[in-house]
């Protein structure tokens, strides 16, 4: 099973990775994070739904129903969890699935919640089965059963919990068990952002960072950010560095383009690793089909890195196909590299 920490290790220096790079980047993200739904850009349908559900829960003086947020990394699941707590006017307690190793870890969190508080569990698909078992009655009945004592003297004690809201986030909704998934009343999938939406996010972040940027400059960064706010904000900070040294601190479209070309991020948001693999497919294997092991050997990367770090975005964008015979480049990527795709059926012996 490929998890977040493994993905970070596989590509620690990729500028266009949707995973947070380090604690310093986490701190910057927190500073740039919108605090209210009114400030949140994109995900219009989810935003509207949450606004209605939160307003209704507050009107009835109830805890919001449990919320499951899923989708690719870097799209704002953690941000939405913080916004839910802020809009409800309650505290947020944050943890992650791998941290909750024992039932007692979860019990300690739950028993310290105030009424209507939000408990946010990131990577909730990584909860251990024993912790999940404790969570089920907590979500349904706001009660937990804990064992006191050991051996023959051990006894089960039922503890009442204040009504609370669990917000779970995952990049792998399919790995959630059915009983856990069924206990969420609100289930929302986050989608990739449009360039226009990311342009607004880049402009807002630039204001918070005191960076001068034109609308065209913001859009140029947005177009190369792979539909992901985390990547857009990271690119903005690197373009800011370039602009301060080379352009008097002002980001125009030309400055953004020059900075991103220097950083090896092209007009499709592909970086050196992406282009290395795609060019090998086109030039060494005629566009495929090519087996994963051959492709890994050709570019000097592991098969895990190709499958879990490089491929997902290329497949999602339609630049690469997985077939029973191997990987194949699509027509659009031949065009991007300025090459003519081979004609079906091979060479015409009669020149027709």
Curated annotation (Swiss-Prot):
Give the span(s) annotated as Head domain (RuvB-H).
267-352
The UniProt annotation puts the region (Large ATPase domain (RuvB-L)) at: 4-193
EC assignment: 3.6.4.-
State the InterPro entries in the record: AAA+_ATPase (IPR003593), AAA_lid_4 (IPR041445), DNA_helicase_Holl-junc_RuvB (IPR004605), P-loop_NTPase (IPR027417), RuvB-like_N (IPR008824), RuvB_C (IPR008823), WH-like_DNA-bd_sf (IPR036388), WH_DNA-bd_sf (IPR036390)
The UniProt record gives the binding positions of ATP as 32-33, 74, 77-79, 140-142, 183, 193, 230
Superkingdom per UniProt: Bacteria
Please, one GO biological process term? Answer: DNA recombination
Q: Specify where it is mainly localized.
A: cytoplasm
Under PANTHER family, the record lists: HOLLIDAY JUNCTION BRANCH MIGRATION COMPLEX SUBUNIT RUVB (PTHR42848:SF1), PTHR42848
Quote the subunit structure annotation: Homohexamer. Forms an RuvA(8)-RuvB(12)-Holliday junction (HJ) complex. HJ DNA is sandwiched between 2 RuvA tetramers; dsDNA enters through RuvA and exits via RuvB. An RuvB hexamer assembles on each DNA strand where it exits the tetramer. Each RuvB hexamer is contacted by two RuvA subunits (via domain III) on 2 adjacent RuvB subunits; this complex drives branch migration. In the full resolvosome a probable DNA-RuvA(4)-RuvB(12)-RuvC(2) complex forms which resolves the HJ.
- Tell me the protein family, please: Belongs to the RuvB family.
UniProt protein name:
Holliday junction branch migration complex subunit RuvB
Q: Which organism is it from?
A: Azoarcus sp. (strain BH72)
* Underlying gene: ruvB
